């Protein structure tokens, strides 16, 4: 379903290495012509040192042609550079392999103290840090992400936050962990990178906006694979004003992922409050971005149009199954979305016959009653069943005055944030083309 595919938009904010998994996914889904995807891969590979991979793609794309001489020559050059960097880095790596050094690294959090220790014990010098960084980056460009992550870790613990390569090394470490699918380590690196960006007083507002936009896109890999990711994405994208502002200003298409995270959230009570805040954002941004997932929420919670909501839900299935980040959320999304339709319908009507519900849910009355009983039993639905009359009666929990004040205060706070963001949004004329230094090139196909 190419109409709703966001790969080209998302790839614009990713390092080129992170785009490869998306292209592999599209290839399996057969959304685009395979030759177009192979051309895209070859274009991405042209700026990396993954020459063997490029040769394989070239063979698949042009089976009748010889491998270009430029690729063969590049391979020789890359191998030569790798050997040279290995020779320069080997003595440095041996220092880190020393048991005493390992113990010192584990016991101290002070990079300067560790640097002084290495200088005293192993004659470590400042230029070694640049060598280590160059070697890590070269390993990354060759597709050796485990090596890159290891050397970037050594680099990170030694350099101060003011080092010219400090921020770039955090981007590289995060990318490496993502590409190795080490989600715990990636979550730690994501948190560290976010703190660095948020606490950076040197960057201009425009640079910070661009960095946050990149972080938002890279975080999708982590949030939709880490066990706590769907909670964290809501907290970051919806309730951190600077990141919500970045989404509204630079990348409203991210609302698809925020909406999916809210709908599939397992905390029922939290989800209801979050939905209210999400609906406000979706309404506000509906003129800049909409797809079946955001429209489903709008149909159900703004227009209370149940027929349109059912129609959009069917479209959501196609969107989810063809989205690299959301395909694993399909079952949770459909189950919870049906529950939302059912719950909203019942809340409007307060009392409804089971036979009517069965008809709406395409079930027999007995199946519908069992389904509702399970929802009540699992505390996912506040309702009672009158078996004699064959009715479902929705609960009407009284809200304390204190809770009402809290909710109204939250609402006022949220509206204030939105107002401030709209002012910033009108003032911001950010370029969407700048990339983190680690990537060095725009990506896309």
Curated annotation (Swiss-Prot):
Species whose genome carries this gene: Salmo salar (Atlantic salmon)
Disulphide-bridged cysteine pairs: none
CDD domains: eIF3E
Gene Ontology cellular component list: eukaryotic 43S preinitiation complex; eukaryotic 48S preinitiation complex; eukaryotic translation initiation factor 3 complex; eukaryotic translation initiation factor 3 complex, eIF3e; nucleus
Record localization: Cytoplasm; Nucleus
Protein name: Eukaryotic translation initiation factor 3 subunit E
UniProt keyword Metal-binding present: no
Coiled-coil residue windows: none
Similarity comment: family membership: Belongs to the eIF-3 subunit E family.
């Amino acid at each position: 379903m190419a109409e709703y595919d966001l790969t080209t938009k998302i790839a614009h904010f990713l390092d080129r290495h992170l785009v490869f998994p998306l292209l592999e996914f599209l290839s399996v889904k057969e959304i685009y012509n395979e030759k177009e995807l192979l051309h895209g891969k070859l274009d991405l590979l042209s700026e990396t040192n993954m020459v063997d991979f490029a040769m394989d793609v070239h063979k698949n794309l042009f089976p009748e042609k010889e491998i270009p001489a430029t690729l063969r020559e590049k391979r020789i050059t890359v191998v030569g550079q790798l050997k040279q960097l290995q020779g320069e880095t080997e003595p440095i790596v041996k220092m880190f392999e020393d048991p005493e050094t390992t113990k010192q690294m584990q016991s101290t959090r002070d990079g300067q103290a560790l640097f002084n220790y290495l200088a005293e014990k192993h004659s470590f010098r400042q230029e070694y840090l640049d060598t280590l960084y160059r070697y890590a980056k070269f390993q990354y460009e060759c597709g050796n992400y485990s090596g890159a992550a290891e050397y970037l870790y050594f680099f990170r613990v030694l350099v101060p936050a003011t080092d010219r390569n400090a921020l770039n090394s955090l981007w590289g470490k995060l990318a490496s962990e993502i590409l190795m699918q080490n989600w715990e380590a990636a979550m730690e690196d994501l948190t560290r990178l976010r703190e660095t960006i948020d606490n950076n007083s040197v960057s201009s507002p425009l640079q910070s906006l661009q960095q946050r936009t990149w972080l938002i896109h890279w975080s999708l890999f982590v949030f939709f694979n880490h066990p706590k990711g769907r909670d964290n994405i809501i907290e970051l994208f919806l309730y951190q004003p600077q990141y919500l502002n970045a989404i509204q200003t630079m990348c409203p298409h991210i609302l698809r992922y925020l909406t999916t995270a809210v709908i599939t959230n397992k905390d029922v009570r939290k989800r209801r409050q979050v939905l209210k805040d999400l609906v406000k954002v979706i309404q506000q941004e509906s003129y800049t971005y909409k797809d079946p997932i955001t429209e489903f929420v709008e149909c159900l919670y703004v227009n209370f149009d149940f027929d349109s909501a059912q129609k959009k839900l069917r479209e959501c299935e196609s969107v989810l199954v063809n989205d690299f980040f959301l395909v694993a959320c399909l079952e949770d999304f459909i189950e919870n979305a049906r529950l939302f339709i059912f719950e909203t319908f019942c809340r409007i009507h307060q009392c409804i016959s089971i036979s009517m519900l069965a008809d709406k849910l395409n079930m027999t009355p007995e199946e519908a009653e069992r389904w509702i009983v399970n929802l009540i039993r699992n505390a996912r639905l506040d309702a009672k069943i009158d078996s004699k009359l064959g009715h479902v009666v929705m609960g009407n929990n009284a809200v304390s005055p204190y809770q009402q004040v809290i909710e109204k205060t939250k609402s006022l706070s949220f509206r204030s944030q939105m107002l401030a963001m709209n002012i910033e949004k009108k003032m911001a004329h950010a370029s969407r083309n700048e990339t983190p230094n680690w990537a060095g090139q725009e990506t896309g196909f």
